[in-house]
């Protein structure tokens, strides 16, 4: 597991109040992890803070699973 992947999973677990073991790549925030729309907004903000990136609203709406969040972070974090 990459450092970015581990950090994303930790943030998701903290933001959604679930065990880190439950946060697997294929899980959807709403359907599988019980997030609501406010949770997803707060999650995006936490990812922005953690990685020092800005996620535009139109991109944030597409980030609906753990893997999509990991991919977005990997593709947008400056090395």
UniProtKB/Swiss-Prot annotation:
Gene3D superfamilies: ACP-like (1.10.1200.10). 4'-phosphopantetheine is transferred from CoA to a specific serine of apo-ACP by AcpS. This modification is essential for activity because fatty acids are bound in thioester linkage to the sulfhydryl of the prosthetic group. Its main location: cytoplasm. It comes from the Bacteria. The keyword Lipid biosynthesis applies. The modification O-(pantetheine 4'-phosphoryl)serine is found at residue 37. It is found in: Cytoplasm. One of its GO terms (cellular component) is cytosol. Signal peptide: none annotated. Keywords: Cytoplasm, Fatty acid biosynthesis, Fatty acid metabolism, Lipid biosynthesis, Lipid metabolism, Phosphopantetheine, Phosphoprotein. The keyword DNA-binding does not apply. InterPro entries: ACP (IPR003231), ACP-like_sf (IPR036736), PKS_PP-bd (IPR020806), PP-bd_ACP (IPR009081), Ppantetheine_attach_site (IPR006162). PANTHER family: ACYL CARRIER PROTEIN, CARRIER DOMAIN-CONTAINING PROTEIN. Carrier of the growing fatty acid chain in fatty acid biosynthesis. Belongs to the acyl carrier protein (ACP) family. This is Acyl carrier protein. The gene is acpP.
């Amino acid at each position: 597991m990459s450092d970015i992947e581990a950090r994303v999973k930790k943030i998701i677990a903290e933001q959604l109040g679930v065990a880190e073991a439950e946060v697997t790549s294929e899980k959807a925030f709403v359907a599988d992890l019980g997030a609501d729309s406010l949770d997803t907004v707060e999650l995006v903000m936490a990812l922005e803070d953690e990685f020092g990136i800005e996620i535009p609203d139109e991109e944030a709406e597409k980030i609906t699973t753990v893997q999509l969040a990991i991919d977005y972070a990997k593709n947008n974090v400056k090395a």
